[in-house]
């Protein structure tokens, strides 16, 4: 390297000695989930709550750790999901992004929709537990057209608890259950339009789905220990109601074995 200046001498040569090495990249923190020789930054996809007509987006960061060019592909896509990959092919050590767009108009109904997509690790890959990525979306009713008078006279849901801990019981028994009281504290009939579970280990029984003002009913929650397994799904319940202040009610369940 030559350096010219207005000093004396006005020309100086610099020599550098060293060894050129390839940059060492550690993706374990930015992309903590390993599927085959592919690292990703998300192993489940929970879309934000949506209303009819909205199209939320989720991004999955992908890194190719294999020695061959890799084309990221999500298999078993449902009709309400669309994907875009940039770049289409990843060389060794290269990062990319899979963009998923949810079309809410193609969801079948209110409440929770669950499915699984599968990340192809190589051309011709098959689906299995190792490359499964659970997907969930919740479609809510739209109360934006209600007047202030209608809101003032609307139903209102109240629960005795939204947190259920069955860990102590499941430590000794194979099944646990707990009752939750639901009350309509509003001024018009409360409708529980949907009651859904996120996990196959959870069961529910609701005595009444329509409550008059001041009326209560019982919701029984059951968890079967052997069905908890290793599924990456939330232990919680979801209710969709006609309460404009609480169209979605979630009940979280703890069930450490």
Predicted regions and their residues:
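Beta-strand-rich interaction surfaces with strong enrichment in secreted/lumenal proteins
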Residues: 48, 85-90, 105, 167, ...
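Surface-exposed binding patches on compact interaction domains or structured appendages
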Residues: 67-95, 187-216
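Short, hydrophobic beta-strand segments
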Residues: 98-106, 219-227
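Short, solvent-exposed loop/turn segments enriched in Ser/Thr/Gly
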Residues: 2, 11-13, 52-59, 105-118, ...
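Long, low-complexity ectodomains and other extracytoplasmic segments of secretory-pathway proteins
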Residues: 6-57, 123-181, 185-186, 243-257
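Beta-strand-rich extracellular modules
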Residues: 2-8, 103, 120-124, 224, ...
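Solenoidal tandem-repeat scaffolds enriched in leucines and small polar residues
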Residues: 32-34, 39-76, 82-84, 88-92
């Amino acid at each position: 390297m030559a350096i010219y200046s207005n000093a004396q001498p006005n020309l100086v040569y610099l020599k550098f000695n060293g060894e050129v090495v390839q940059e060492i990249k550690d993706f374990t923190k930015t992309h903590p989930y390993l599927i085959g020789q592919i690292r990703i930054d998300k192993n489940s996809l929970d879309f934000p709550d949506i209303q009819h007509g909205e199209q939320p987006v989720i991004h999955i960061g992908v890194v190719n750790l294999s020695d061959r060019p890799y084309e990221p592909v999500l298999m078993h896509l449902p009709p309400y999901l669309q994907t875009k990959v940039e770049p289409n092919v990843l060389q060794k050590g290269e990062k990319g992004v899979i963009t998923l767009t949810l079309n809410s108009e193609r969801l079948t109904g209110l409440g929770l929709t669950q499915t699984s997509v599968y990340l192809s690790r190589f051309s011709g890959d098959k689906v299995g537990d190792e490359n499964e990525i659970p997907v969930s979306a919740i479609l809510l009713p739209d109360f934006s057209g209600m007047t202030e008078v209608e809101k003032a006279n609307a139903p209102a849901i109240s629960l005795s608890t939204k947190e259920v801990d069955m860990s102590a019981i499941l430590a000794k028994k194979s099944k646990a259950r707990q009752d939750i009281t639901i009350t309509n504290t509003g001024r018009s009939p409360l409708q529980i339009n949907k009651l859904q579970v996120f996990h196959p280990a959870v069961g529910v029984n609701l005595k009444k789905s329509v409550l008059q003002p001041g009326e209560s009913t019982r919701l029984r929650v059951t968890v079967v220990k052997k069905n908890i397994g290793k599924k990456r799904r939330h232990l919680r319940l979801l209710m969709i109601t006609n309460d404009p202040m609480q169209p979605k009610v979630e009940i979280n369940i703890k069930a450490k074995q």
